[in-house]
Regions:
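OB-fold ssDNA-binding interfaces and closely related basic DNA-contact patches used
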Residues: 1-103
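Residues in flexible loops and secondary-structure boundaries
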Residues: 25, 48-50, 112-114, 161-169
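Compact mixed alphabeta submodule
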Residues: 119-187
Length: 187
């Protein structure tokens, strides 16, 4: 039996998670649906992942031409529509975490599966935060709304590979404090 291969699906190489809203869906505003989301920061040196993403965007474009065309007479060229692969050096020049990297914002209305390096489910919310390193399975698809059209990125699953420096200026409690040895430490 042959396993189906979705050309619009990518499992990334090691990337860094930013704006990680993976435990609770959040709405961007009062008129939008709550979604789980993450920004995947991909080093520009990971050319294998970047090429897989570009190929998946192309596949989503070809698959979604009817949707992208909408009521128009023709399908807009891929270069003229919104795509999710963005250059951190150009779009986030003041953010060190995005230096020499591309990024993709992925979201979903359903919760992603979250596992560790051994593929064991992670239940402790403190294990996944903005700054952690891991991999993600993502899918690309065409969209056409009243205000824009393009290719979007859907979040499927997350795999944590290792801890990283927390992003957003929030430190972890276990990093801020040492173990207290003296029972009478208040005096």
């Amino acid at each position: 039996m042959t396993k189906y291969h979705n050309p619009a699906k990518v499992v990334t190489g090691v990337c860094r998670f930013s704006y990680a809203n993976l435990w609770e869906a959040k709405a961007m505003d009062e008129n939008s649906k709550p979604k789980y989301s993450v920004s995947l920061i991909i080093p520009k040196s990971d050319t294998k992942t970047i090429e897989k993403i570009r190929a998946a965007i192309q596949a989503a474009y070809e698959e979604g031409q009817g949707k992208l065309k909408g009521n128009s007479k023709s399908v807009p060229p891929l270069t003229s529509i919104k795509t999710p692969l963005r250059d951190g050096d150009l779009e986030r020049p003041d953010d060190e975490a995005y230096a020499n990297s591309y990024f993709v914002n992925a979201n979903s209305i359903t919760a992603p599966g979250i596992v560790d390096a051994a593929c064991q489910q992670i239940l402790d919310h403190s294990e996944i935060y903005s700054g952690v390193y891991g991999r993600a399975s993502i899918t690309f698809y065409a969209f056409n709304t009243k205000t824009s059209r393009g290719i979007a990125c859907g979040l499927q699953n997350i795999q944590k590979l290792r801890d990283g420096e927390p992003l957003g200026g929030h430190s972890r409690a276990e990093d801020d404090f040492a173990t207290v040895e003296d029972e009478d430490f208040l005096n």
